[in-house]
């Protein structure tokens, strides 16, 4: 009898949302979620009710209905992950409830987006990003909605025919991918390691290591491309910025998971996590669903805030790729302007979206790699122009504990001038993967122009797992150890902060004699300049510094190689 009364109370609470002006109430969502967790055995009834409510509620209440689905769905997801016995997909389990929601989520999202105003649409877009990172629903479902309703992932490449596209139907899409994988040859990593790798002679050890790198790159070149098998192209790989240690990030995430609450709904930004079932669902009215809320769990290969997006004109994050030429560079050298920022002094309760939010007035953030234990993060923004804007204008009043300086996201670390945020790189130090990313990256790079002496471009995106990067096998630069190395930015004895203002990209004083600019007609207009303005010079900030002597860290390079081999072996086992 008591159970019937409780269920009727759940139904009455759900119906009461219709009487609210906005259709949103944090306390009522908390009440529904608590009941749903306490009565998993009747999840079929509960899920059926919230699905029907989302379908039948007024247009102004569609967003609120998705918040209900979000709170209950992520609570069930967390229950499934924390309790191995609840992972079966049988009726009366959390997994079954999530699966039921997944079958209708595209329909509910399409209906809600079509009937919502612009403000609600933007909040639904944020929900998609939250679900993408938490793993609540399949990426293919969410990407289908993005393509259909937000036009975020539509490419300008008209050469692709219908037969080359994966079906949006999940079952058919899975069959196509599996069929494509079956046709792919298995990876064979039988590469012998030279005995000189363990030599005490640095010269022999370095030669042996380069021999292994050359063998690996030659091996990868001989592997047939997955995209050339059959007529179905696999989904595009995530473009992940390779700044930190993957194992370190995994350990950090495991420590976070071990102390997290059962609910996936987080506290408001910068607040301490609540404890106990009764208090773990904060009010939606308190910005629970704002873009700054730290309510997402980032996967190992998912540091991009908007994964799988393309740099196309209908994407709000579209940026041109400025390319120029600097005749003062040494022969066979290129210049790369960084888009990566090092953020120090990050509080322990600050998450990825919090960092993106505080920087948003100055730049749109593309990716974040956060190391809470060391209180720092590497943030990549979409353009050099935005990176300079952050360094020049962010936190000028010192109201936040955050410190910013240039970071390196591409190329050997010892080639970077950390004070001005650019690298002058000998072309022979670029790996094959570096060269590929430089010309084919979605953001940054040469936009297809060949790598030649003197070319200047913005830091390109890289793709982890597609080869060895020159940054990964380079030696780390200690802080405050050299003229062009990184500096701490902490207050010195006099109380001031030691820093050097960034040289504006394209507005730096020219060396004497001025460099001759070779601008090709196909050069694109830099982000932030009107089409009718003359293209600013993107020459050197000063006379080109002497080519840094190549430094060799055999341990770091060997570790990087072993990590890459382990990744390839894992991919082989999974396929």
Swiss-Prot record:
Molecular-function annotations in GO: mRNA binding; protein domain specific binding; RNA binding; transcription regulatory region RNA binding
Gene3D superfamilies associated with the record: 1.25.40.90, 3.30.70.330
One CC-aspect GO term: nucleus
Region named Disordered: 225-282, 468-575
Keyword RNA-binding: yes
Biased composition (Low complexity): 517-527, 549-575
Domain spans labelled CID: 1-153
Name of this chain's protein: Protein NRD1
Keywords in alphabetical order: Nucleus, Phosphoprotein, RNA-binding
Positions carrying Phosphoserine: 263, 265, 271
Role description: Plays a role in sequence-specific regulation of nuclear pre-mRNA abundance.
Biological source species: Saccharomyces cerevisiae (strain ATCC 204508 / S288c) (Baker's yeast)
GO terms for biological process, alphabetical: antisense RNA transcript catabolic process; CUT catabolic process; mRNA 3'-end processing; nuclear mRNA surveillance; sno(s)RNA 3'-end processing; snRNA 3'-end processing; termination of RNA polymerase II transcription, exosome-dependent; tRNA 3'-end processing
Biased composition (Polar residues): 471-482, 491-501
Subcellular location: Nucleus
SMART domains named in the record: RPR, RRM
């Amino acid at each position: 009898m008591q159970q019937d009364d409780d269920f009727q109370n759940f139904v009455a609470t759900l119906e009461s949302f219709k009487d609210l002006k906005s259709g949103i109430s944090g306390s009522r969502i908390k009440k529904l979620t608590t009941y749903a967790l306490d009565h998993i055995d009747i999840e079929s009834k509960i899920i059926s009710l919230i699905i029907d409510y989302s379908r039948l509620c007024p247009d102004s209440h569609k967003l609120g209905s998705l918040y209900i689905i979000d709170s209950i769905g992520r609570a069930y997801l967390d229950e499934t992950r924390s309790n191995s016995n609840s992972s079966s997909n049988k009726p009366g389990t959390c997994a079954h409830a999530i699966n039921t929601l997944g079958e209708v989520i595209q329909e509910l999202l399409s209906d809600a987006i079509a009937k919502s105003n612009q403000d609600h649409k933007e909040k639904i877009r944020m929900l998609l990003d939250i679900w993408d990172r938490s793993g609540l629903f399949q990426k293919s479902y969410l990407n289908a909605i993005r393509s259909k309703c937000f036009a975020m992932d539509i490419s300008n490449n008209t050469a692709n025919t219908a037969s080359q596209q994966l079906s949006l139907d999940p079952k058919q899409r899975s069959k196509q991918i599996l069929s494509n994988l079956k046709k792919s040859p298995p990876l064979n990593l039988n590469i012998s390691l030279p005995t000189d790798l363990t030599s005490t002679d640095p010269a022999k050890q370095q030669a042996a290591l380069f021999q292994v790198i050359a063998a690996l790159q030659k091996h990868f070149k001989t592997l047939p491309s997955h995209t050339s098998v059959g007529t179905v192209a696999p989904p595009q790989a995530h473009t992940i910025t390779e700044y930190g240690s993957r194992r370190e990030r995994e350990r950090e995430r495991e420590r976070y998971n071990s102390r997290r609450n059962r609910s996936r709904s987080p506290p408001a930004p910068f607040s301490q996590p609540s404890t106990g079932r009764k208090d773990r669902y904060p009010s939606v009215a308190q910005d629970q669903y704002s873009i700054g809320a730290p309510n997402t769990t980032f996967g190992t290969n998912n540091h991009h805030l908007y994964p799988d997006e393309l740099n196309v004109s209908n994407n709000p994050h579209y940026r041109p790729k400025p390319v120029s030429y600097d005749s003062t560079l040494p022969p066979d050298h290129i210049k790369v302007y960084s888009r990566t920022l090092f953020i120090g002094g990050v509080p322990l309760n600050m998450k990825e979206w919090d960092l993106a939010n505080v920087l948003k007035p100055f730049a749109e953030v593309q990716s974040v790699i956060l190391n809470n234990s060391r209180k720092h993060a590497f943030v990549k923004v979409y353009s050099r122009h935005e990176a300079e804007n952050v360094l020049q204008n962010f936190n000028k009043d010192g109201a936040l504990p955050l410190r910013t300086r240039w970071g390196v996201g591409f190329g050997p670390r010892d080639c970077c001038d950390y004070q001005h945020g650019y690298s002058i790189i000998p072309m022979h130090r670029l790996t094959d993967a570096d060269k590929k990313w430089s010309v084919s990256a979605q953001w940054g790079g040469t936009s297809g122009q060949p790598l030649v002496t003197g070319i200047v471009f913005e830091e390109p995106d890289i793709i982890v797992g597609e080869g060895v990067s020159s940054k990964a096998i380079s030696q780390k630069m200690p802080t405050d150890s050299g003229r062009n190395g990184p500096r701490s930015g902490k207050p010195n004895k006099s109380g001031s902060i030691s820093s050097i203002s960034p040289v504006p990209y394209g507005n730096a004083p020219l060396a004497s004699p001025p460099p001759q600019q070779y601008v090709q007609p196909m050069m694109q207009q830099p982000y932030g300049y009107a089409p009718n303005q003359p293209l600013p010079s993107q020459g050197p900030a000063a006379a080109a510094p002497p080519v840094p002597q190549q430094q060799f860290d055999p341990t770091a390079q060997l570790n990087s190689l072993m990590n890459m081999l382990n990744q390839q072996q894992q991919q082989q086992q999974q396929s």
